Amino acid sequence: MMSEEVILVSYGEITLKSSRVRSRMERVLIRNIISQLKRNRIDVLKIHKEGGRLFIWTSNNKDAIKILTKVFGVVSASIALKTGLNLNEIVNGVKKYSKEALINAKTFAIRARRPNKDFPITSIELARILGDAVLKEMPNLKVDLNNPDKEIFVEIRRSGAYIYHERKLGPKGFPYGVEGKVVALMSGGIDSAVAAWMIMKRGCTIVPVYYDMGHYVSSIAKERIMRVLKWLKEWIPSEKVKVHVVPLAYAHELLRGIINERYRCIFCKAMMYLIAQEIAKEVGAKGIVTGESLGQVASQTLDNLYLLSRLIDIPILRPVIGF
């Protein structure tokens, strides 16, 4: 078998689910990966699923790796060299791979795993054989199993042996879209952006809502919300994301005329909640996510959050409440 380059993707929490739920989440993860790569003009030539791993062949592995680090559900992604299961093929593959991977290293370690228990050599013995082969090719190196400069990983699976050394970390969590929709209240600040990102990581699709306060906010604030939305879009596999912009300047002006300044902030927030709930009903969202942090401002005291929550019939999700 000829050796070939392939992307190895690992995922974590998904594997803890029941077989039915896991299968559904894996399908969504694969669909999201294809969408993200396609949006960035990278063709997916083939995908193989095996034992908590995805093996992906693309038209541009180097750029694909960068994109995969922004796909929810991905724990890590690596460019791997695939060989056959013949020991000589694996040894030759590791020697070939090591010449580039260990070029600046003084010490190294081989980490072998054998999910394919039909393979006749144990993981420990295989690591020793491969380590000896590397030392013969590169005698200036030394083995250090505790604190090596570089590690080379070898996974023995039914479809072949996979050799890699770099793991690009992904966001983990669940695939985007497996938990339904939520309305995300976006202010342009860091709290609302992080809250939206965290709920996306748990598998929710977001429907961003921005309240345009007109002349009450600066042009810089409006530019900031655009930057935040652009950043969030990088993590969303959909081609288009509809942002609901609600003009609220006139309503705020009315509140200034009839509501005592002491209570104006909480009334304004209540209005935002009620509008968000109507949007949620319209789009079929099951909750509202906000960037509220307990005690940060007057409208975010426990008493006021309690009052606001009683106005709404659907769940209010506050991922950053304790930060």
Task: Locate predicted features.
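RNA-binding accessory domains that recognize and position tRNA/RNA substrates
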Residues: 1-183, 193-241, 310
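Active-site adenylate/phosphate-handling loop in enzymes that bind or generate adenylated species
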Residues: 132-134, 140, 167-179, 248-323
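Hydrophobic/aromatic beta-strand patches that form the interior of the parallel beta-sheet core
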Residues: 152, 207-209, 244-246, 289, ...
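Conserved G/P- and acidic residue-centered "switch" motifs that form tight phosphate/ATP-binding loops
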Residues: 189
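S-adenosyl-L-methionine
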Residues: 233-256
